[in-house]
Amino acid sequence: MSNKGQLLQDPFLNTLRREHVPVSIYLVNGIKLQGQIESFDQYVVLLRNTVTQMVYKHAISTIVPGRAVNFSAAENDDAAA
């Protein structure tokens, strides 16, 4: 994946993780997973609900936060660090 992709993904996923935002993750096959993002790396997202699931990023179509989150503030915080 390109660096530009990481510059968008990491602050987005990190904000969802830090703020314990409930998310719906839609997979490319249409399955909907729900939970909170526990962790992530270049290839996978760990999604916690009643159990923790490892979801490969190449299988993810869309991530929808369960509530409004200010991502521009998170990008500024990460840039300042």
UniProtKB/Swiss-Prot annotation:
Keywords tagged on the record: RNA-binding, Stress response
Function: RNA chaperone that binds small regulatory RNA (sRNAs) and mRNAs to facilitate mRNA translational regulation in response to envelope stress, environmental stress and changes in metabolite concentrations. Also binds with high specificity to tRNAs.
Family: Belongs to the Hfq family.
GO cellular component, one term: cytosol
GO terms assigned for molecular function: RNA binding
Record PROSITE patterns: SM
CDD domains per the UniProt record, alphabetical: Hfq
Native source species: Variovorax paradoxus (strain S110)
Name by which UniProt lists this protein: RNA-binding protein Hfq
The protein's assembly and partners: Homohexamer.
GO BP annotations listed: regulation of DNA-templated transcription; regulation of RNA stability; regulation of translation, ncRNA-mediated
Gene name of the record: hfq
